[in-house]
Curated annotation (Swiss-Prot):
Its EC number is 2.6.1.9. The keyword Amino-acid biosynthesis applies. It catalyses: L-histidinol phosphate + 2-oxoglutarate = 3-(imidazol-4-yl)-2-oxopropyl phosphate + L-glutamate. This is Histidinol-phosphate aminotransferase.
Amino acid sequence: MEKLARKQVQELTPYLSARRIGGTGDVWLNANESPFNNEYKTDFARLNRYSECQPKALISAYAAYAGVKPEQTLTSRGADEGIELLVRAFCEPGQDAILYCPPTYGMYAISAETIGVERKTVPLTSDWQLDLAGIESNLDNVKLVFVCSPNNPTGNLVKREDIVSLLEMTKDRAIVVMDEAYIDFCPEASTVDLLAQYPNLAILRTLSKAFALAGLRCGFTLANEELINVLLKVIAPYPVPVPVAEIAVQALSEAGLARAKFQVLDLNANRAYLQVGLSMIPGLQVFEGWGNYLLVKFPDGDALFKAAWDTGIILRNSPIENCVRISVGNRDECEKTLGFIRNYYS
């Protein structure tokens, strides 16, 4: 049956999520999930009815949290669907292109490749920042420029002045899509305030990370009202199930926000603990991280990754040579991981 598939799909290499890769163990630090398992109440009495396309309570709650108007907010099945909607809505297959800066999140490329949209890449500089000159020279036919900050997998923040320069550079030419999936761990670095000045800015958000709701699949796109209305033309009729909307609204309540803030503080402290401990091991390079993960360069990254895997510590291998990404778990998970790595190099 594969021969009946579209040519692009036949040639497509799927994104290998942490769950697809699998593994067995008791320390799971491979998917940048939160270690907190919070409880919520759900009303199952309305499951015979379809959900609203854009549940008003959810849109209002997230808009208030993000500091934007409800008209500037769209909710979807995770930020991944937001990526797909942007590509489908703004890119003509065989004509337009997206641009992204590796090493970075893999779904930008997959979403474009799936529908036959060209992918242009301008690698990050040696310190993981934007190569603005390289981007400018590759903007022909580009409709979307994806920038992840904090960047996955490197963990760094993209310089704000470079983001502003990029927005100026792409005015009336392309949309800059800021992927802020991890911004709740460093909210002061958000670009949400730039929405008022730049109509060519879109921002992706999620409840998967800081809100500990990876299994819920609830994300958001923030942009000007005109851009949001374009996305509403191509979104599925019922993208957010009733239980998802109900749980998300609880997470965005006053009590839910207070809990998320406390848990972010806890995870940031664990990240600092892990960063300091790893930095003291000779031969390791620990890159500064602003999300709930750290990128670490080992003398022999593949061997370290496999050894950890074999002992039940599941980390995330990286396409960057000898680098492994380590999610920040609870203190016990961080201690076990740090202890294993110390012993491995002792």
